[in-house]
From Swiss-Prot:
It comes from Xanthomonas oryzae pv. oryzae (strain PXO99A). GO terms for molecular function: quinone binding. Functions as a PqqA binding protein and presents PqqA to PqqE, in the pyrroloquinoline quinone (PQQ) biosynthetic pathway. It comes from the Bacteria. InterPro entries: PQQD, PqqD_bac, PqqD_sf. The lineage of its organism: Bacteria, Pseudomonadati, Pseudomonadota, Gammaproteobacteria, Lysobacterales. The keyword Lyase does not apply. Pathway: Cofactor biosynthesis; pyrroloquinoline quinone biosynthesis. The gene is pqqD. It holds the Pfam family PqqD. GO terms for biological process: pyrroloquinoline quinone biosynthetic process. This is PqqA binding protein.
């Protein structure tokens, strides 16, 4: 498994998609034979996993959008990314 860095450009793995689940009334990541529920924060991060933006860029966008500390946001983005990568939902 590769190390997560602020320069990583995550994208959802093939077969994984972001979808609103009406039964659960929330956004989820759908993967073969599993569903990962996303809270509001995880959703705004996951929506930016496009394979072109670095984690640092994602954090800067979110810090500007929510008027929050960029370093705190970056740490949270990296932590979420590491968790989703461990679940084999992302490629870097």
């Amino acid at each position: 498994m590769s190390s997560i860095t602020r320069d990583g450009q995550p994208a959802l793995r093939a077969g994984v998609r972001l979808q609103y689940d009406r039964a659960r009334d929330q956004w989820v990541l759908l993967a073969p034979e599993r569903v990962v529920e996303l809270d509001e924060i995880a959703l705004v991060v996951a929506q930016r996993y496009d394979g072109t933006r670095s984690l640092a860029q994602i954090a800067q966008e979110l810090a500007a959008e929510f008027d929050a500390d960029a370093a705190d946001i970056e740490a949270d983005v990296i932590e979420l990314t590491a968790t989703l990568q461990q679940k084999r939902l992302l490629r870097l």
